[in-house]
């Protein structure tokens, strides 16, 4: 049996977590199936922030543009499944250049999971993904191309999700 700590501290993700880190399509939909109910979204932050150099690079900004300040709409949330502790910590970065036309609704999500909007018409979206270990847990960072707009979404699987997934 894998312990709670190994889910957080191993250099490689637990085998049982790999499908969740690599899934294409809506993570929201799969988490709701696992929870047996809609996800509860707790907003931690919504507002404008300057992008860091690393975030600019992840969004594909290159050359001299890297040295210029860039604002993004940032949304940070906890996603709850079917218990009192959050399963996933998520951060969504929407560069201002991506928030034009109908994409402006991404600033008005409130307690709606972003997956409801992104995967409303398509089961998958063009993306680039990386997986890394953070102090909070295993994280997938996905750069989506949503109708020609770049969106960077980071989803960290928290200890409670690992415990439930691994049946600890």
UniProtKB/Swiss-Prot annotation:
InterPro entries assigned: Chorismate--pyruvate_lyase (IPR007440), Chorismate_lyase_/UTRA_dom_sf (IPR028978)
Alphabetical keyword list: Cytoplasm, Lyase, Pyruvate, Ubiquinone biosynthesis
Pfam families: Chor_lyase (PF04345)
Main location: cytoplasm
Binding site for substrate: 75, 114, 155
Subcellular location: Cytoplasm
Matching Gene3D superfamilies: Chorismate lyase-like
Biological pathway: Cofactor biosynthesis; ubiquinone biosynthesis
Gene Ontology MF annotations: chorismate lyase activity
Domain of life of the native organism: Bacteria
E.C. number(s) listed in UniProt: 4.1.3.40
Catalytic activity: chorismate = 4-hydroxybenzoate + pyruvate
UniProt GO BP: pyruvate biosynthetic process; ubiquinone biosynthetic process
Cellular component terms per the entry's GO annotation: cytosol
Stated role: Removes the pyruvyl group from chorismate, with concomitant aromatization of the ring, to provide 4-hydroxybenzoate (4HB) for the ubiquinone pathway.
Family, per entry: Belongs to the UbiC family.
The protein's name: Probable chorismate pyruvate-lyase
Annotated source species: Psychrobacter cryohalolentis (strain ATCC BAA-1226 / DSM 17306 / VKM B-2378 / K5)
Underlying gene: ubiC
